[in-house]
């Protein structure tokens, strides 16, 4: 019995000692955590903001499927989701913006993307998903190897955007731009602009010009556009120059001098944004005029440099044509024989 009491006494003492130890540690930690570190603020002028781009998307699926895709673990995401009126899967009577990811955090909406020399735009952008469901099909006879977003092998019917959606989008975008000064007009872009080989959203029905009128995003001045168009009708810039102009504005395109697949995709994305009434993927005087009108407005020095090249190439081509004509005429024979009709 004596031994049992001794054992109990020792155990009680150990328990009390442990409780005191825990209490002392807790108090010590509280004192340390509450103490003010010797930190003084000395603001530097040398810093930047994380957010530099605002990217517009359409979901291509209804509201409920969009929520599942953007919210459930393991999927994609965006910072905001704007539902659509008359969507049977939307449970509320009035539209409201859903905030899915805090703006200070990275959302998974841009994927493999490039704009104005920056890559992986998830790191530096805010993404807005808008519920809008186009109907797209691929040509079954074209083969599995052809999987481009633009071209004859793909058919898409794009519906108009809900006006109530656009009202919410304009209000949200203005609020975002007011808080993120690094998002310049040319940095308000669509998913197709930053990933033209694999995306076509927000599509040619997206009201870019309406947003521009509200102070959101870029657009050309009509008079400037018309002047470039008239000039390029007389002498169209070569494909290499247009490729460089598109790259200067922000698109991920290399100058190859030929109308290759990358050029077709980039030109299609550009036309959906700035010439939505003619999405052909072809380089013509209107497309070139729109690109140069945008550069003239937002990157004037670069536009001037490209026009210097344009004039030099025009003069060079004119000289080459004159030399070729002279080469044909300088001999005694200036006709091609045999002639179809002999005199």
Residue spans of the language-model regions?
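Second-shell loop/turn segments in exported
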Residues: 67-68, 114-117, 152-164, 196-198, ...
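Surface-exposed patches in mature extracellular/periplasmic domains of secreted proteins
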Residues: 68, 176-191, 254-258, 279-282
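Acidic, His- and aromatic-enriched active-site or binding-groove loops in soluble protein domains
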Residues: 81, 204-228
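Short acidic, glycine/serine/threonine-rich helix-capping segments at coil-helix boundaries
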Residues: 232-304
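Extracellular LysM carbohydrate-binding repeats and other cell-envelope/extracellular binding modules
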Residues: 276-342
């Amino acid at each position: 019995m004596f031994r049992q009491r001794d054992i109990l006494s020792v155990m009680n003492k150990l328990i009390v000692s442990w409780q005191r130890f825990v209490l002392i540690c807790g108090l010590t930690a509280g004192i340390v955590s509450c103490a003010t570190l010797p930190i003084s603020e000395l603001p530097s002028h040398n810093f930047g903001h994380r957010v530099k781009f605002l990217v517009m998307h359409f979901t291509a699926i209804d509201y409920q499927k969009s929520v599942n895709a953007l919210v459930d673990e393991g999927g994609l995401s965006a910072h905001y989701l704007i539902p659509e009126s008359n969507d049977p899967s939307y449970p509320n009577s009035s539209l409201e913006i859903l905030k899915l990811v805090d703006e200070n955090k990275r959302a998974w909406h841009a994927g493999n993307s490039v704009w104005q020399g920056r890559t992986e735009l998830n790191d530096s952008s805010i993404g807005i998903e808008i519920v809008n469901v186009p109907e797209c099909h691929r040509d079954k006879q074209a083969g599995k190897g052809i999987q481009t977003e633009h071209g004859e092998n793909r058919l898409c019917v794009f519906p108009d955007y809900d006006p109530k959606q656009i009202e919410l989008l304009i209000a949200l975008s203005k609020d975002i731009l007011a808080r993120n000064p690094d998002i310049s007009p040319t940095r308000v872009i669509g998913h197709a602009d930053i990933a033209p080989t694999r995306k076509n959203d927000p599509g040619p029905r997206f009201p870019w010009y309406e947003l521009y009128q509200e102070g959101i995003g870029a657009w050309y001045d009509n008079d400037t556009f018309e002047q470039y168009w008239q000039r390029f009708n007389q002498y169209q810039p070569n494909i290499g120059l247009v490729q460089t102009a598109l790259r200067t504005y922000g698109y991920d395109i290399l100058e190859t001098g030929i109308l290759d697949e990358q050029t077709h995709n980039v030109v299609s994305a550009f036309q959906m944004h700035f010439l939505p009434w003619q999405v052909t993927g072809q380089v013509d005087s209107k497309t070139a005029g729109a690109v140069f009108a945008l550069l003239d407005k937002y990157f004037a020095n670069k536009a001037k440099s490209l026009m210097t090249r344009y004039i030099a190439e025009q003069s060079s081509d004119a000289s080459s044509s004159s030399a070729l004509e002279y080469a044909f005429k300088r001999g005694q024979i200036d006709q091609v024989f045999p002639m179809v009709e002999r005199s």
